[in-house]
């Protein structure tokens, strides 16, 4: 057998899949990399879908990494289908290493008829600046071929279970915290690739009109600064945006609010307890009672971090939301209503505006003034 194909298998047993594809962001002793692939071709004479698995070791020679084994196999397969456009999908236990990432970029550049989507269970060395730059080069090349990288969510794990695992018709049983780990990795990948928000998404969700219908999602944009010589210095690698997770989406049976998703990812930043940090959030809705309580608890447990919250609108479910805002205020979080300056800052920083300036909607300033007065009354416990 060709040595490149020795580690090509048709399927894996359930325990091996759950062990190797577990998506906890930091995992030790997972040195085997699994790559499940699907290859589809376009056109009326397309051959059937090809789907198998390669495996390799992280610390072995580069030629033994599963990505390189796939390329070796694919080069032979491609000779039979040279003129056809191909859609290649990978499902990987680890994202490609730095060298493999560069080889993936070369592979795509040499064959423009191939598109590649990479779903990863975990991110390899995501804190390393060189690795972050390699991922950006692979996924953000504007004038050339690029890969589309995503974090595996419940649907992808279930697909792999059904497609590549000898499950004997057993249902996929997600492990504890699968959806939470997905959100953390999704946010981290967004930070690395510097994802931007669609302009319509921003203007629709951050519009501060007092009466909005159908705005059930909460968007949260954030940035982090570190105090250096009495000056706040922006940490460019620590900014991004996210939204709440709706019920039954990505494995969340009850959903998860944006603020809680945000708190989930902060521990993975490894903020130095000897330094001072300022975290600023720009939210389409102010926090609900539970989220406000959790954010206040975070501040109390992390004295080296200060929190500033700018909200486009005030969330009020006629419950304890006002009490939650007062709890945040008492915990010394700075809570304010977004004004034109904050909307423009978010537009310039978090939106894929393609060079277009921020255009304020009618009565933006008037709505901000009214909401600011209402927030002051809530924090002073007036009329409650």
From Swiss-Prot:
Pfam families: NAD2. Its main location: cytoplasm. Zn(2+) 2 binds at residues 257, 288, 291. The record marks 244 as: Interaction with DNA. Its cofactor is Zn(2+). Zn(2+) 1 binds at residues 65, 97, 100. It catalyses: a 2'-deoxycytidine in single-stranded DNA + H2O + H(+) = a 2'-deoxyuridine in single-stranded DNA + NH4(+). Residues 29-138, 214-328 form the CMP/dCMP-type deaminase domain. It is found in: Cytoplasm; Nucleus; Cytoplasm, P-body. The modification Phosphothreonine is found at residues 32, 218. One of its GO terms (molecular function) is RNA binding. Its EC number is 3.5.4.38. The keyword Thylakoid does not apply. Residues 209-336 are annotated as: Necessary for homooligomerization. GO terms for cellular component: cytoplasm; nucleus; P-body; ribonucleoprotein complex. GO terms for biological process: cytidine deamination; cytidine to uridine editing; defense response to virus; DNA cytosine deamination; innate immune response; negative regulation of single stranded viral RNA replication via double stranded DNA intermediate; transposable element silencing. InterPro entries: APOBEC/CMP_deaminase_Zn-bd, APOBEC_Cyt_Deaminase, CMP_dCMP_dom, Cytidine_deaminase-like. Residues 1-60 are annotated as: Essential for cytoplasmic localization. Residues 213-215, 313-320 are annotated as: Interaction with DNA. The active site is at residue 259. The CMP/dCMP deaminase domain 1 mediates RNA binding, RNA-dependent oligomerization and virion incorporation whereas the CMP/dCMP deaminase domain 2 confers deoxycytidine deaminase activity and substrate sequence specificity. Belongs to the cytidine and deoxycytidylate deaminase family. Homodimer. PANTHER family: DNA DC-DU-EDITING ENZYME APOBEC-3G, MRNA EDITING ENZYME. This is DNA dC->dU-editing enzyme APOBEC-3G. It comes from Pongo pygmaeus. The gene is APOBEC3G.
């Amino acid at each position: 057998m060709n040595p490149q194909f020795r580690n090509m298998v048709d399927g894996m047993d359930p325990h091996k899949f759950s062990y190797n594809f577990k998506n906890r962001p930091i995992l030790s002793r997972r040195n085997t990399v699994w790559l499940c692939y699907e290859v589809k071709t376009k056109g009326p004479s397309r051959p059937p879908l090809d789907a198998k698995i390669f495996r390799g070791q992280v610390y072995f020679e580069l030629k033994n990494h599963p990505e390189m084994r796939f390329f070796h196999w694919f080069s032979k397969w491609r000779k039979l289908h040279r003129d056809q456009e191909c859609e290649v999908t990978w499902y990987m236990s680890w994202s490609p290493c730095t060298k493999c990432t560069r080889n993936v970029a070369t592979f795509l550049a040499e064959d423009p008829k191939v598109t590649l989507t990479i779903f990863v269970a975990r991110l390899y060395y995501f804190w390393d600046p060189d690795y972050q730059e390699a991922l950006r080069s692979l996924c953000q090349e504007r004038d050339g071929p690029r890969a589309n990288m995503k974090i595996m969510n419940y649907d992808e794990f279930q697909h792999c279970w059904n497609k590549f695992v000898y499950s004997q018709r057993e249902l996929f049983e997600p492990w504890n915290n699968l959806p939470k780990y997905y959100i953390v990795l999704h946010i981290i990948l967004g930070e690395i690739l510097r994802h931007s928000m669609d302009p319509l998404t921003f203007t629709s969700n951050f519009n501060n009109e007092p009466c909005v219908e159908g705005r059930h999602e909460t968007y949260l944009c954030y940035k982090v600064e570190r105090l250096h010589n009495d000056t706040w210095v922006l940490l460019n690698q620590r900014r991004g945006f996210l939204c709440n997770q709706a019920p039954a989406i990505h494995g969340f049976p009850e959903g998860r609010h944006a603020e809680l998703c945000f708190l989930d990812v902060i521990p993975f930043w490894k903020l130095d307890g000897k330094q001072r940090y300022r975290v600023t959030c720009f939210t389409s809705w102010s926090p609900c009672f539970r989220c406000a309580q959790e954010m206040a608890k975070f501040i109390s447990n992390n004295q080296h971090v200060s929190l500033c919250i700018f909200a486009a609108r005030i969330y009020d479910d006629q419950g304890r939301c006002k009490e939650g805002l007062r709890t945040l205020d008492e915990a010394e979080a700075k809570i304010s209503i977004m004004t034109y300056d904050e909307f423009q800052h978010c537009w310039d920083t978090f939106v894929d505006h393609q060079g277009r300036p921020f255009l304020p909607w009618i009565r933006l300033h008037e709505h901000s003034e009214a909401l600011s007065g209402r927030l002051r009354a809530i924090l002073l416990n007036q009329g409650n």
